[in-house]
């Protein structure tokens, strides 16, 4: 297994992995990204995200997408892990852990105070995987979101 930073040539593979994650999460209908969107997000003039990929026999079979964050509480930068996904036939081979290990190396190099992400309550194997690496699972925290319609609605309201 080779873990490396994503390259522009990987855009189609990135999209296939993200589609696989959306299927795994049961939210494929929410996936609107295209290969061009991926190329722009990761390799455009102002990249929005980063990624590591896992390769087996020169085939991309796993991914960790992430971006930089900042914690005011600990006054340090951090990383938000957006997606961690390995195709099912390559699971239980240490590939997810290898991706996480490389992400931790990046976090250490950049003096990050933490890496954050979400994991579904019903994803028992994912929760166990993360806890096996020393992660804390915060049951009391709820993920919140404003979608595009809510953002536009709130932004257009009078002060």
Task: List each model region and its residues.
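Conserved beta-strand-loop-alpha-helix junction that forms the acyl-donor binding cleft
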Residues: 117-126, 145-148
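Glycine-rich acyl-CoA binding loop
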Residues: 54, 92-100
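Conserved GNAT-fold acetyl-CoA-binding loop/helix
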Residues: 15-41
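A short beta-loop-alpha structural element at the N-terminal edge
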Residues: 2-16
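Conserved active-site alpha-helix within GNAT-family acetyltransferase domains
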Residues: 97, 101, 121-140
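A short helix-loop-beta-strand connector motif used in the catalytic cores of GNAT acetyltransferases and
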Residues: 40-53, 80
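Conserved GNAT acetyl-CoA-binding A-motif
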Residues: 108-118
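Conserved beta-strand in the GNAT
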Residues: 53, 59-68
